[in-house]
């Protein structure tokens, strides 16, 4: 029986560096800084749950007795996994209901709250419009508000992740209890990122792909579904391409029918990991790993801080945390080499599936020394549970060894998971701690202030919302932050400040000749036009005119703000001025002529008398531009009769040539 000493030692090191992350919660090691804004009660709950797991694992007979009772119930494996996944989904929903939504999901909720937003332009890499439609369909059925529906669908995404992982674990020969720990962690990460993004589906595709890979290697039959699922996963999220080396080795095995060699895979994987570690240390040494402990200034002077003990400790912390499971895998490889036996083909494939994503995780954003995008990091770190559970099944530990290793594994998994799915019942304290964390890491806190601003915006607290974006602009000149501040100043009728923010957005978008899809959304004037119409109804045309002018400043190439201004002038019955404005608009954009005619034709069919008068006046102005004097006379006659001889309409009618 092979010993688990290397495996236990590796996780002991991991527990040590995790403890470092807890003692220094401002360390931005992957996820642990979120512990800084969890309550003391939540941390006690973490410690109690970890102690309970450790106590149970020291008496395997208890676990064995419980497992025996469960085995007495005859259920199909797929049904059993589905029940476990649903139970996890209930837990995810409970956790989500008890925590404030301060992550990326808050921004998605902010967009879902806008019924006029483009469903194809949602936040995220490739968000499915069908999932947005699911949100809209669930709202009237469940009676939930947008955050409630969001929590429900996020929990469902966690269910999908857990179920897919359990199916893979069965293919890898891992017991459901051990697999469930990893599945819960995986689903919790999916829940934290908040929206039902395609990288959750990517994780499911990778799970099925690796399960089919293991099964087909054992049976000696090549499966075409493996490369097809690899392509699908990469289409869902490009981070999945890091799993392609394992797929390439599998395809090579399927074509040549030659077994994979342990030495070749071992040296390839080890060499790549050494290169990644080197890149990590070099970039962190010279620039400062700002994603980790931000204790040094950025720029050329950063090298003067490289010998600070906390700098060196933080580099080691991040490296061991990311590479710890790989070190365990290498220990297992050395243990296997002592017996002078080759690893099985599936074990080698999973080695490749572990090493390349971890290397990409370290080298993804090399000037930072570590992957900064957490959704990409989530996708790449999926390799860790794939290979770690596979390693566990390879060793086949004895009950005593399992009792010694399980507490370490469970504690590590809980500390990784709980910061993401969080148990936080006190929203006020959470907001205070979140703000505190942002101030500890000012150079990289712009996105955090963005999250907080979206949170306050949904709560209709405009002053807090504006403060968050002012703080965000101190650290990042993101044009979207300027846009949000412009909306705030418009709502306060602070026109000069709003104009300054609008000009900042426009200058950033048109700084070069290429306007990307993301920049197109920044100059979308629809929200400003809605605010203009609201001002027109509440306080008259003066404020509305200012908003429409700001909208024209935001996107000088758009015809929508001038059209909105002309339509407002029609409603004031200043038809001579409206005719001049429409003439200029049609000269610049001929398509607007048919749009205006269609709009006013729809108005004359409405039951409201005021809307019908507006429609006839608009049709008269358009007919005058087209040279249709008879049509203009007819439309104005209808408007005059409906308005009981309005003097402004009568004056415009009198000015028309007979």
Predicted regions and their residues:
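Short acidic/glycine- and proline-prone juxtamembrane loop motifs at membrane-interface regions
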Residues: 103, 191-201
